[in-house]
């Protein structure tokens, strides 16, 4: 199976399965000289990890990361950084009854047809459990970007189902289990999740990511445009079904006179483009949105087929998120950080800045 690596200079390769022994990643291209410890990674891992809220999956993983290589006396050496997280709370028996069935909305069918074999325990490699290593790698990128350029990457839940959550404050984002910036919406979100858990259903969500203080010049025309790489990275997250950059799909209803970001000697008058022009960052904040589909693993009975192509009913047991978008906030931040880190190093290599 290919496709486990992202980046050209700052390269992140992940490995491991949902119910395997461990998850891991190798990071190549990390510059030397950054002070780094596992504590730097643990903050974001704790934000993502399961079992921390009654509104997410109750699988209880500590997600304690171990740095295997690339750091000496608390400082990066420039060599490959190896990271590993042990899986502690697998419950593979939850999947024994459906091991020969294809779960609707999951990768079971496509993995089986392509590879002829699949790990049915929690989806194996296709599980969002894999994203723990992305968050770990992204934490390293976030720290380096902030120190070197002042870049700050933050995200929040901007919608869950038909509940819109307009931005209010970054402080509020870390004060509730939904990563919602609007405290007036938290009760509605709680009630929605309670209702979904009672009915055994799930719901989709929208995450907004903002990267501040990004310098002018990140991105490479034509096929390595910054917006293309960001979209690629965000769409690689499990359950992601759409990405918007800047005004996104609302540009369909705009006129050119409305959409163009006019310039003055003091800077841009607007930011409809979301901080990227011609595939290159323009110095404005980068605005992105990601849409996540509802969790496919639900307790409601549904129709599917088995390995013999026979029609069967399926009810999925186990511990699953009623809304995967909640824990996607630190994952989305990590993917944006990995892309910006890669483009920072590429920018330096080409432009010597």
Curated annotation (Swiss-Prot):
Q: Which domain of life is it from?
A: Bacteria
Q: Summarize where NADP(+) binds, as residue positions.
A: 48, 54
Quote the InterPro entries the UniProt record gives.
Chorismate_synth, Chorismate_synth_AroC_sf, Chorismate_synthase_CS
- Annotated positions binding FMN: 125-127, 238-239, 278, 293-297, 319
Which family does the record assign? Belongs to the chorismate synthase family.
Q: An example Gene Ontology cellular component term from the record? A: cytosol
The cofactors required by this protein are:
FMNH2
Q: What is this protein called?
A: Chorismate synthase
- What is the organism field in this record? Buchnera aphidicola subsp. Schizaphis graminum (strain Sg)
Alphabetically sorted, this entry's keywords are: Amino-acid biosynthesis, Aromatic amino acid biosynthesis, FAD, Flavoprotein, FMN, Lyase, NADP
Family matches, as Pfam families: Chorismate_synt
Instruction: Give the cofactor note.
Output: Reduced FMN (FMNH(2)).
In which pathway is this protein known to take part? Metabolic intermediate biosynthesis; chorismate biosynthesis; chorismate from D-erythrose 4-phosphate and phosphoenolpyruvate: step 7/7
What is the recorded function of this protein according to its Swiss-Prot or TrEMBL entry? This reaction introduces a second double bond into the aromatic ring system.
Summarize subunit and interaction data from the UniProt record for this chain: Homotetramer.
Task: Report the top EC class in one word.
Answer: lyase
Q: Which residues form a coiled coil?
A: none
């Amino acid at each position: 199976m290919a496709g486990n690596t992202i980046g050209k200079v700052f390269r992140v390769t992940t490995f491991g399965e949902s119910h395997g022994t461990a998850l891991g990643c190798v990071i190549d291209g990390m510059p030397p000289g950054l002070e780094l410890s596992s504590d730097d990674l643990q903050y974001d891992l704790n934000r993502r990890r399961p079992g921390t809220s009654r509104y997410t999956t109750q699988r209880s993983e500590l997600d304690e990361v171990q740095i295997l290589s690339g750091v000496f006396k608390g400082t990066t050496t420039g060599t490959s950084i190896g990271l590993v997280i042990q899986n502690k709370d697998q419950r593979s028996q939850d999947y024994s009854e459906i091991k020969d069935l294809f779960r609707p909305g999951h990768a079971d069918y496509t993995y089986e047809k392509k590879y002829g074999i699949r790990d049915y325990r929690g989806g194996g490699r296709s599980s969002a459990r894999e994203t723990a290593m992305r968050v770990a790698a992204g934490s390293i990128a976030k720290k380096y970007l902030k120190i070197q350029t002042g870049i700050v990457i933050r995200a929040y839940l901007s919608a869950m189902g038909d509940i819109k959550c307009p931005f209010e404050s970054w402080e509020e984002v870390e004060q509730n289990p939904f990563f919602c910036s609007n405290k007036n919406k938290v009760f509605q979100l709680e009630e929605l999740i309670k209702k979904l858990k009672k009915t055994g259903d799930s719901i989709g969500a929208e995450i907004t990511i903002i990267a501040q203080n990004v310098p002018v010049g990140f991105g490479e025309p034509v096929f390595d445009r910054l917006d293309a790489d960001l979209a690629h990275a965000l769409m690689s997250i499990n359950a992601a079904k759409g990405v918007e950059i800047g005004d996104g799909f609302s540009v369909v209803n705009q006129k050119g006179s409305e959409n163009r970001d006019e310039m003055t000697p003091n800077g841009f008058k607007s930011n409809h483009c979301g901080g990227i022009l011609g595939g290159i960052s323009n110095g404005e904040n980068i605005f992105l949105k990601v849409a996540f589909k509802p969790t496919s693993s639900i307790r409601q009975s549904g129709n599917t087929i088995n390995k013999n192509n026979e029609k069967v009913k399926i009810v999925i047991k186990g511990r699953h998120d009623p809304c995967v978008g909640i824990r996607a906030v630190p994952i989305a931040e990590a993917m944006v950080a990995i892309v910006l880190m890669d483009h920072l190093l590429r920018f330096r290599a080409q432009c010597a800045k």
